[in-house]
């Protein structure tokens, strides 16, 4: 019996190795780890793309608002130019009327007329 006991002691000293195919189990655990990792990476990538799109959208919105503001400013300036042109034409017309009036007054006044009598006195 000593031989049997010795054999049992020797067997317990060795590590038992399973002869079943463990590659399936290790691949499954690797695959499940990758499944957990990829969605996180995809979510992070999607978040980065979403943030990038959000920044781009905000920039486009800001530029559109700026363009609209500039268009309104241009319309206001154009209206002001038209008003100034009208006022200028009105003032030119009034100046012509006043110029003609002054010319008529000067020709009717004896102060501004040259007389032959003054030149004859000398």
Swiss-Prot record:
Subcellular location, record wording: Golgi apparatus membrane; Golgi apparatus, trans-Golgi network; Cytoplasm, Cytosol
Name of the protein in its database record: Short coiled-coil protein
GO BP annotations, alphabetical order: positive regulation of macroautophagy; regulation of protein complex stability
UniProt keywords, alphabetically: Coiled coil, Cytoplasm, Golgi apparatus, Membrane
GO cellular component entries: cytosol; endosome; Golgi membrane; trans-Golgi network
Protein family (similarity comment): Belongs to the SCOC family.
Quaternary organization: Homodimer. Interacts with ARL1, ARL2 and ARL3. Directly interacts with FEZ1 and UVRAG. The interaction with UVRAG is reduced by amino acid starvation, but the complex is stabilized in the presence of FEZ1. Interacts with NRBF2.
Protein role: Positive regulator of amino acid starvation-induced autophagy.
InterPro entries xrefs: SCOC
TM segment ranges: none
Residues forming coiled coils: 43-101
Principal cellular location given in the protein's record: Golgi
Membrane association type: Peripheral membrane protein
Organism encoding this protein: Rattus norvegicus
Region annotated Disordered, chain positions: 1-26
Any Pfam family: DUF2205
Keyword Secreted: no
Gene that encodes the chain: Scoc
């Amino acid at each position: 019996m000593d031989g049997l006991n010795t054999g049992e002691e020797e067997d317990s000293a060795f590590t038992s190795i399973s002869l079943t195919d463990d590659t399936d189990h290790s691949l499954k655990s690797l695959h499940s780890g990758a499944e957990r990792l990829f969605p996180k990476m995809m979510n992070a990538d999607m978040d980065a793309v979403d943030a990038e799109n959000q920044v781009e959208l905000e920039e486009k919105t800001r530029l559109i608002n700026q363009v609209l503001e500039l268009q309104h400013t241009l319309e206001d300036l154009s209206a002001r130019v038209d008003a100034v042109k009208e006022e200028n034409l009105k003032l030119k017309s009034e100046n012509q009327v006043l110029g003609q009036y002054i010319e008529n007054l000067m020709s009717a006044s004896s102060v501004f007329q040259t007389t032959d009598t003054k030149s004859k006195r000398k």
